[in-house]
Amino acid sequence: MRVPVKPMPNAPSPENPMGREAERAEAGRQGFDAVLDNLEFFLTRLRGLSCCRSVDLPGGGFCLFTGSDSASENWVFRRGAAPDEEAVHAALRFFEACAAGEGAAPFIWPLPEGGGVLPRFGLPERGRLLAMSRGCGGPADTADGGNPEVSFVPVLDEAGAERWAETMWQGFGAGPGAPGNLHVLVRGMRADGTLTLVTARIEDQDAGTFLLASAPSSPAAGVYYFAVPPRYRRRGVATAMMAEILRIVRRGGKRQVLLQATPSGVPFYLAAGFGALGEIPLFSAGDDVF
C-alpha cells in the first residue's frame, strides 16, 4: 500500500518546511491506519453473524466468507508484513471449503504492496481502493447540504432490511432481484445492533443506502454500501446522503468520517470534502473486486 513516508525527527516551524511535511506525513499515516482500524472493526462484526463463515490465519489476520459469489464481498484481512506461503495455503483451503462447486469461493486480499507471494498463487492485483477521510465537527460542516425532497429512514426491521438490500444491489449497477444470500447478510447486519443501516427515500420510494460502522471508543465512523440506483442519480440523492451521514456522525459524538472509495466514486468524495490518505491494492483470482 502507499503509506505516507515516515516522519523526519525535525520539529515543524515556519523556517522548517521539512518539519511541516513530516507532520503532514504523520497525520496521513495515522489517518490511513484509522481507515484500516475501521475496516477491521466492520469485518469483525460480520465475522460474528451466523450467516458468515470465518477462520483465523496462522501469523495473524482472518478469512471471511459472507456466502456471496462475488469476490468483493469475501475477504482476507491481514495487516503488517506481506503474507507467507503458509497463510496463503490456509486461506485457499478455507475458501475451497466454502465453495458450492469446484474450485474456491472468490475473495479479495487487500494491502500488501506488490502482493508478496500472492500473484504466484493466482492472486494478481485487480484494482485499488482509495482510503479517504474528512472531519465533521467544524463550522463549515454544520451547514445544511441536504435536499428537502430526500428523507431518511433507519432500518429497524426485517422488511426494511429486505428493501435496503434490494436498493443497494441496484445501486451497484445490478438489475432487480438481489440474491438470497445478500438478503440474509443484510438481515444479519441489521440485527447486529452495532451497525447503522439507513435508507434514503424520495416520494415514498427507496432511493439510496448507506451503512455506518464505528467502534464505541473510536472518534471516527466508517461508511459502507453507499449506493444510489441509476434512476435517482441526477436528483441530488448522494449529496443529501452525505449531509445526513455528517449529521448522524456528529450526533454520535464522532469527529471524522472514513471510507474506501472505488475509482468511480473518488470524484464525488473529493467534491464532498474528503481527502486522500493512501491506496489499498486488492488481490484476487477474479476481476469483480469493486
What are these regions (language model features)?
Residues 114-125, 235, 239, 251, ...:
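Conserved active-site alpha-helix within GNAT-family acetyltransferase domains
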Residues 54-59, 111-116, 120-124, 194-210:
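Conserved beta-hairpin
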Residues 80-156, 261, 281-285:
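Acyl-donor-binding surface of acyltransferase catalytic domains
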Residues 71-81, 219-230:
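Conserved acetyl-CoA binding element of GNAT-fold acetyltransferases
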Residues 176-229:
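A conserved beta-strand-loop-helix scaffold within acyl/acetyltransferase catalytic domains
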Residues 157-170:
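A short, well-structured alpha-helix characteristic of acyl/acetyltransferase catalytic modules
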Residues 84-93, 225-230, 234-247, 251, ...:
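Conserved acetyl-CoA-binding loop-helix of GNAT-fold acetyltransferases
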Residues 2-101:
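N-terminal charged segments
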